[in-house]
A protein has these predicted regions:
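Anionic group-transfer/hydrolysis microenvironments
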Residues: 27, 48-50, 95, 134, ...
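Active-site-proximal beta-alpha core segment in soluble small-molecule metabolic enzymes
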Residues: 1-130, 139
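Short glycine/threonine-rich loop-to-helix capping motif typified by GTGT followed
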Residues: 102-109, 140-153, 184-196, 254-257
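Charged (often Lys/Glu-rich) extended helix/loop segments that serve as interaction or gating elements
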Residues: 170-276
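Conserved active-site and cofactor/substrate-binding residues in soluble primary-metabolism enzymes
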Residues: 28, 70-73, 77, 104, ...
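Conserved protein kinase catalytic core
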Residues: 52-54, 141-142, 184, 214
Length: 276
């Protein structure tokens, strides 16, 4: 699936050449896609319900302020126009929160999208081929933190499917997911060396990696666990672990307790396998 926003014409054309399922971000993209690359047989639209999503996180929790997706009325109108332009199979996509650590997020998202799907099919008569629940199921970056239970999450989605879609005669609709962070984030590591140690109002460990290699801490203030492979235990100190970019937010850790480190030590920054 090709999900994008503010998409250049040549990228829509390339997606069509690849045979990718295009996921339109905006109602206005219907006319744009028609001129840029033509309307494919299978197409999807991204939904934004507006309001505040109570199960959201600081990364994404306010759909009304998000630049992604279209309103319900826009999505319904888009489906009508796309059908008239030759589209035969349709999908619905939404991402309402990012990196949730809650077994409730996916089932609640599913419930909202399944109810939307029933209404959309009723008002447009389209053949709904799939619903893409996207991502949002995250990991706990704190080593001792609570984790998602994917079996419980899956059961919640299944219950919503049977109660809403199956009951409405839509039991053939496929469900897609995009659980990249959940599957991959724990299995990536950023390995870096301590190159400098500086003492002013704080103690700084300068390393040979930077926000160029891992942006989350600089962008979101996100926590990533750090291990000193040369000194995993022993006396500790409070440090900032920083890169060399000329930006004061180029920091992997702020006021973090780590074993006393020396120049040349190898640090491992954990859980970097996704959204780096």
């Amino acid at each position: 699936m090709f999900s994008s926003n503010n998409t250049p014409a040549e990228e829509f054309q390339f997606a069509r050449d690849l045979g990718a399922t295009i996921n339109l971000d905006a109602y206005e993209d219907v006319a744009f896609l028609k001129e840029a690359a033509g309307i494919p047989e299978v197409i999807s639209c991204r939904y934004n319900p507006g309001g505040v999503f109570e199960l959201g996180t600081s990364i994404m929790d306010n759909p009304e302020e998000a630049k992604f997706g279209m309103t319900k009325d826009q999505l319904i109108q888009a489906f009508k126009e796309l059908k008239e332009l030759g589209a035969e199979k349709f999908g619905i996509h939404a991402l309402l929160a990012s990196n949730t650590v809650s077994n409730d997020y996916y089932p609640e998202l599913a419930r909202q999208l399944f109810e939307l799907a029933v209404e959309v099919v009723d008002k447009t008569g389209v053949e709904l081929d799939f619903i893409n629940l996207s991502g949002g199921v995250g990991i706990n970056y704190q080593p001792e933190g609570e984790e998602n239970d994917i079996a419980v999450i899956g059961q919640g989605v299944r219950q919503a499917y049977e109660a809403i879609l199956t009951q409405a005669g839509l039991g053939q609709v496929k469900i897609y997911t995009e659980l990249g962070r959940f599957m991959l984030a724990p299995y990536g590591l950023l390995v870096t060396k301590v190159t400098h140690k500086k003492q002013t109002y704080r103690t700084y460990l300068g390393v040979d990696a930077s926000a160029v290699n891992l942006l989350r801490p600089a962008m979101y203030g996100s926590y990533h666990h750090i291990t000193n492979m040369d000194r995993p235990e022993g006396e500790t100190e409070i440090v900032d672990v920083v890169g060399s970019l000329c930006e004061n937010n180029d920091k992997f850790a702020i006021n973090r307790s780590l074993p006393v480190s020396q120049i040349g030590d190898t640090l491992v920054i954990h859980d970097t396998g996704a959204h780096g």
